[in-house]
Amino acid sequence: MALRCAGVTRKGIQCSITSGSRLTDERGRLVAEPLRLGGSYCRFHARPFVTRCVEHFDGPAILFFLDLETTGVDVASDQIVELACIHAPSDPRANGAAFSTVVRATAEDTAFHVHGIEAQEIAAAPVLSSAWARFLRFVEDIQMTTIQDCTDSEGEEEDRLTLLPSEFPTVLLAAHNGIRFDFAMLLFELVRHGMTWSALDRWLFVDTLALAQAIGVSNLGGCAKLQCLVRGHCVGLQAHRALDDCIALRAVVQGVAESYGMGVIDLLRPLAVRLDLAASAAQVCTM
């Protein structure tokens, strides 16, 4: 099974769940590689990361871009050393709030040459449980602020105070290569540390690799890495730290959305999936 993205139009990225050969346009040119879901694409190391496709998603949403820096690339054994996230307001001219923290890790850090975070800073950083709690508060604060901005009268204020978490605007969490790495690494770490991941059950997830496939990467030498997209869209990128990558990814996606006269959330809606966290977490526990 594959999620095929036929390209971007003013109606959004045209995607469908199907199987078969690669998708080509009317001239036979390759438009997009299939984004594979389930056991063939979304995986924890060598295990499947179970996903549930979203058939229809048109409600209010709040978009965040996430990035992790880690001790290595093996989600089954490496650990998070930095967690960052940036809110993407509906107005692309607005900056949006940002969250960033270094995280204490005990695994051997083989990726210092990538992120450049000193061992002393990692050793003195908050543990993952503390960082995760702060991250959840950051997301919830943005949700409440968004609700507050949409309510005016005193009666609406009372209604806002009685809202259940399930009634908040949907959190849409985007990451580049997120299905294979960032989301998988995050869930692995939460399960390993015996922490709750129930909030993630209410969120939707977008892997922006699918966007790269939809818009085509032939002009970038076939490279779909974030660094290639950044260079291809003339976006400045600082040192490879998590928050810098979040900012760069937001700029790339906003640039694509603007070029098609669309809002960023509308651009990404067709790519949103739910992660079957219970099934995936059960697989983590068997490794």
Where are these regions (language model features)?
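Short, surface-exposed basic-aromatic patches at helix termini and helix-loop junctions that form
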Residues: 191-193
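Acidic two-metal-ion nuclease catalytic site recognized across multiple nuclease folds
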Residues: 38, 48-57, 230-232, 243, ...
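N-terminal accessory regions of nucleic-acid-interacting proteins
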Residues: 1-64
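Buried hydrophobic packing segments
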Residues: 182, 186, 211, 249-253
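Conserved non-catalytic scaffold segment of RNase H-like nuclease domains
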Residues: 47-188, 198-199, 223-234, 240
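Short alpha-helix plus adjacent loop in nuclease-associated cores
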Residues: 205-221
